[in-house]
Amino acid sequence: MSVNVFVTGGAGYVGCALTGRLLQEGYEVTVFDNLMYGGRGLIPYFVDPKFHFIKGDIRDKQHLAEAVRKADIIVHLAAIVGYPACKRDPRLAEDVNIEGTRNLLAVRGESQTILYASTGSNYGAYTGALCTEETPLNPLTLYGISKTKAEREVLDAGNALAFRFATAFGVSNRMRLDLLINDFTYRALKERSLILYEKTFKRTFIHVRDMAASFSFAIRNLEKMKNDVFNVGSEKMNYNKEEIALKIQEKVPYYLHFADTGKDEDQRNYEVSYEKIRRLGLATTIDVDQGVDELIRAYSVIDVHSEYSNL
């Protein structure tokens, strides 16, 4: 009997990449999504009899209980993602990110393992040392605060694990252009200019396909990983904003201006260690150069920035 994986938020940026990978690996995949950002990224999967789609909202506890009943594994992606989107509608962010997660914990069966997509944003601003899974959390934004609360409740509930992902980038069936590397590449290619504030602020990055691969890895290694939290990314992908902008400039000629005034509203600034999950055998495979090359090719068919933003 095949394993049934239930993916909340499966029509989103990460969900579309994950769904395709899981189907290729032979899993039954049920996507539960309210289609807040549309569902076109899922269209290729409807030809696969192992793919199932349920339109629903994790804030609807009764519907969620009915939908999740047959699942073996739950991958919880559904969220209002990122500082700007949470700032725009704080109540919605709390309802989805915290209350929606509580609904899922309330209705899942004891045998159903939850794999939770958490975030490195939980670390906030932390300079002077690499953040490990034991580093005290210091979220600076509503997004980070809501994800930190939800992560804690998921782990406290048991039969679960959490991934604190680096900042995502790369091509997905459901694109996002509000992510740093995706946005910088788009502006370089389409606008031929970029004004950069606070250029020394650091992030760690992970390609969306590597995010999908991490969930696949966890499903195959549940007994070694359950009831724990893991940073997911690569130390080789720790870059500040200037370094990313210059990498893109090597591939796309554009005007880059470093502004002395102005403030990035997202004040995250940290570097992360990924030794813990690497010891288990998981390493990322797609670097920034490859990811940017793919973005440049994909952007030849993308002209409307707002269509692929979470804002």
Residue ranges and their predicted role:
Residues 76, 102-142:
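Conserved Rossmann-fold NAD(P)-dependent oxidoreductase catalytic core, especially the SDR/UDP-sugar
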Residues 2-73:
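N-terminal Rossmann/SDR dinucleotide-binding element
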Residues 140, 152-203, 208-219, 248:
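NAD(P)-dependent short-chain dehydrogenase/reductase
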Residues 146:
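Active-site helix of classical SDR
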